[in-house]
């Protein structure tokens, strides 16, 4: 039995991937709820800031986590360095989201509301990355 890591792509256990997906959704929804309270109370963001409404944030969270879980599974199957590529994808997602936040500022949205939304995005990307790479790690199959 070989103890060397294979450079070949691996796979993810489906149950662990579903567990990572569930943990991500619960953690992000809870953090979004907490950050919504902070955004409204501490930063005095307006109540009509649509990103803070659960009927908007929860479906978007589900879509983002499902997309990330799919990407994680595909990267594990086709890439020899899935965690690195997943990290790069998370960085691009956050950067593009911040650029889109500038559009929200251009429509005269509350600056502190947009900052709170940006914090939500960073927390969400971090939770997804850690859940996928720690709960559903890559299993490498080596041939002897």
Question: Which residues fall in each region the model found?
Answer:
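Short, Lys/Arg-rich, polar N-terminal cytosolic tail immediately upstream
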Residues: 1-15
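Membrane-water interface at the C-terminal end of transmembrane alpha helices
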Residues: 16-29, 122-144
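Internal alpha-helical transmembrane segments of multi-pass membrane proteins
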Residues: 17, 73, 77-95
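Aromatic-anchored segments of alpha-helical transmembrane domains
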Residues: 29-30, 92-103
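Membrane-helix boundary elements
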Residues: 32-56
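Membrane-water interface at transmembrane helix exits
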Residues: 35-43, 72, 76, 80, ...
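Canonical alpha-helical transmembrane segments
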Residues: 60-78
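Membrane-helix boundary connector in multi-pass membrane proteins
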Residues: 99-116
């Amino acid at each position: 039995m070989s103890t060397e890591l294979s450079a070949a792509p691996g796979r993810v256990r489906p149950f662990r991937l579903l567990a990572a997906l569930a943990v991500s959704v619960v953690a992000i929804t809870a953090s979004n709820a907490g950050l919504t309270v902070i955004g409204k109370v501490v930063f005095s963001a307006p109540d009509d800031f649509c990103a803070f409404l659960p009927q908007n944030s929860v479906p978007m969270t589900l879509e983002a986590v499902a997309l990330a879980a799919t990407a994680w599974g595909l990267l594990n199957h086709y890439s020899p360095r899935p965690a690195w590529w997943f990290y790069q994808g998370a960085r691009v997602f956050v950067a593009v989201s911040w650029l889109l936040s500038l559009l929200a500022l251009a429509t005269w949205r509350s600056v502190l509301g947009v900052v709170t939304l940006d914090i939500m995005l960073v927390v969400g990307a971090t939770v997804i990355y850690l859940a996928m790479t720690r709960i559903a790690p890559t299993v490498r199959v080596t041939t002897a």
